[in-house]
């Protein structure tokens, strides 16, 4: 797979068609993906993407990447940084279209994001979380060397659910670092960060 900064025309058809959803429900509230009206679902989702872009600083930013397979958009992978300039920590959020799940793409796209954050941006630690019954996401974290980091509670579709938290340090990532992931445009982004 290939990831590129999100362009608004690539992914809305998947959101509109409900291909981002799964059972058990994987997203916490409020989540635009739970909207029953397809147009409202797309509109609210795009608003959240643009909100993330609008709150940008060297400390706090959200980078949204479209995931492409053979040139076709199949999902999204976000890098979410808070206090990045002082702590070097970040989290991730992702989704895949229902018709490409179970092929290892979740692991590949998270691997690409980790490579960007650690090798490209100099991050020190990655965090992730998922509802305990989100087997796919939790398996990806475990496969990539994340360590369990406690449990918490969150709300999904109005009901409480247990969350599994994960953390991956730079030193652990280094032992699993891949040499087949290429980064492009990172120096320009780092320059942009330095000037804001």
Predicted regions and their residues:
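Charged catalytic carboxylate motif
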Residues: 10, 109, 136
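Conserved catalytic-core motifs of GNAT/GCN5-like acyltransferases
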Residues: 127-129, 145-163
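Conserved beta-strand-loop-alpha-helix junction that forms the acyl-donor binding cleft
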Residues: 128-138
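Conserved G/P- and acidic residue-centered "switch" motifs that form tight phosphate/ATP-binding loops
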Residues: 71, 104, 134
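GNAT-family acyltransferases
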Residues: 1-99, 116, 120, 154-196
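Surface-exposed, gly/pro-biased binding rims or lids
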Residues: 136-140, 144-147, 171
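Conserved GNAT acetyl-CoA-binding A-motif
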Residues: 119-129
């Amino acid at each position: 797979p290939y990831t590129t900064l999100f362009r608004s025309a690539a992914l809305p058809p998947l959101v509109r068609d409900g291909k981002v959803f799964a059972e058990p429900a994987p997203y916490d509230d409020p989540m635009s993906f739970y909207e029953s009206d397809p147009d409202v679902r797309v509109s609210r989702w795009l608003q959240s993407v643009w909100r993330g872009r609008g709150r940008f600083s060297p400390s706090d930013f959200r980078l949204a990447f479209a995931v492409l397979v053979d040139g076709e958009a199949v999902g999204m992978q976000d890098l979410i940084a808070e206090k990045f300039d002082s702590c070097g920590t970040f989290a991730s959020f992702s989704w895949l279209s229902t018709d490409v799940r179970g092929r290892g793409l979740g692991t590949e796209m998270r691997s690409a994001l980790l490579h960007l954050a650690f090798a490209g941006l100099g991050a020190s630690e990655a965090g992730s979380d998922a509802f305990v019954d989100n087997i796919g996401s939790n398996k990806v974290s475990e496969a990539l060397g994340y360590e369990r980091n406690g449990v918490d509670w969150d709300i999904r579709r109005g009901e409480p659910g247990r969350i599994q938290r994960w953390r991956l340090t730079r030193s652990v990532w280094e032992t699993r670092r891949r040499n087949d992931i290429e980064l492009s445009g990172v120096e320009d982004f780092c320059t942009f960060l330095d000037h804001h």
